[in-house]
Amino acid sequence: MSSRKYFGTDGIRGRVGQGVISADFVLRLGNALGRVLTAGRSKRPLVLIGKDTRISGYMFEAALEAGLVAAGADVQLIGPMPTPAIAFLTSTLRADAGVVISASHNPHYDNGIKFFSAEGEKLDDATEAAIEAALDAPFHTVESERLGKAIRTRDAIGRYIEFCKASVPRGFTLHGLKMVLDCAHGATYHIAPMLFRELGAEVVVIGAAPDGLNINDGVGSTHIDNLAAKVRETGAQLGIAFDGDGDRVLMADDQGNPVDGDDLLYVLARSWQASGRLTGTVVGTLMTNYGLEKALAALQIPFQRAKVGDRYVHQALVEGGGTLGGETSGHLLCLDRATTGDGIVSALQVLEALGRDGHSLREALSSLSKVPQQTVNVRLGGGAAKAIVEAASVQQALQQAQAAVQGRGRAFLRPSGTEPVVRVTVEADEAGLMQDTLDRLAGAVRDAA
């Protein structure tokens, strides 16, 4: 939807206390959602509210609850839970919507709101448009007898752990595996260690002491070096890192080498092809490494690229009948197991694949050769990023760059939609070619700016 006023590609996000990420706006947002859900129906809708561990979550949880109850919706407060857990619980508890208070991998001073439909999927454009329209209407409180009620759910953790365990065969075990878990001081801190221990693993845990301010602070999937160092220090066979809200996962092998989302896609695609589980096309994004594209082609596995954002990966999978896709950042979609990106479920799928194939993580990646890739952000002194990208001189430079790496890599430009920046990305099978092409293309963008 091109005319979004508040919603981005993944809900609403920003700095706490600024713009829309304020208590008064979130109060109105809850009321708007409640009015959309109650329209044309006599039964009170049920909305689940979950959050990650950042301190502002208390404030926004209360604001959402008040706005929803005022509009006549019932609320179940789930407390700190991974984003994908709220997607699952919304569906299994037969709720009409789920809301997550989280800014994912961002620092504690940011926060955001994500929404899920009754099916546990991200809201469609029409529903988001209806919420935005309701936001621009006055706050409404229903008559006292129609006010909603709010309760706190106590069994959510157990329900979600069983859901995750059900994503792998009943006989699946991790006995004999020593692993490091980095929970980013986020929403998986009280769930992931318990789950992997229940499956038999010896678990070393870091990033599992949230204080409201330390979420993603030097830990988690955006700081993978911390995990890698702990794997080497403890002699673990692998490490797993989640982000603050648990929808991303990255890993480290037994030598502490970082393993990103492209690597994990390869492990899963290759294993699923061999076992007959793979269906349709594997979906990556514009940022997916060219080496993965080549490796999948060698296995005769169809691959396509979507725009950056797991929303677009999901859309491409649904349209193409596929079940496996993801982003370099660690958003992985296993749609035959979960409706949305789920870090814990994705990690279990990788561990199951390794166990079935009899490989270590490092061995499973030995046949994948990624190419050097680099992105430069060119900040513009003036003019819109899209206009700079479309300038004749920049388009000519882009064509020359693409010709230089043809058959050996890719070159492309992405104008930022939120800041005066053009992102210049080049990848090639030889580092010198990549760097030279990148320098020339970035220079052309700077000259045009």
From Swiss-Prot:
Catalytic activity entry: alpha-D-glucosamine 1-phosphate = D-glucosamine 6-phosphate
EC number, as in UniProt: 5.4.2.10
Binding site for Mg(2+): 104, 243, 245, 247
Gene3D superfamilies: Alpha-D-Glucose-1,6-Bisphosphate, subunit A, domain 3, Alpha-D-phosphohexomutase, C-terminal domain
Database matches in Pfam families: PGM_PMM_I, PGM_PMM_II, PGM_PMM_III, PGM_PMM_IV
InterPro entries: A-D-PHexomutase_a/b/a-I (IPR005844), A-D-PHexomutase_a/b/a-I/II/III (IPR016055), A-D-PHexomutase_a/b/a-II (IPR005845), A-D-PHexomutase_a/b/a-III (IPR005846), A-D-PHexomutase_C (IPR005843), A-D-PHexomutase_C_sf (IPR036900), A-D-PHexomutase_CS (IPR016066), Alpha-D-phosphohexomutase_SF (IPR005841)
Membrane-spanning intervals of the chain: none
Cofactor or coenzyme needed: Mg(2+)
GO molecular function terms noted in the UniProt entry: magnesium ion binding; phosphoglucosamine mutase activity; phosphomannomutase activity
Record-level GO BP terms: carbohydrate metabolic process; peptidoglycan biosynthetic process; UDP-N-acetylglucosamine biosynthetic process
Primary role: Catalyzes the conversion of glucosamine-6-phosphate to glucosamine-1-phosphate.
NCBIfam families (UniProt xref): glmM, PRK10887.1
Family stated for the protein in its record: Belongs to the phosphohexose mutase family.
Protein name in UniProt: Phosphoglucosamine mutase
Taxonomic placement: Bacteria, Pseudomonadati, Pseudomonadota, Gammaproteobacteria, Lysobacterales
Gene, per the UniProt record: glmM
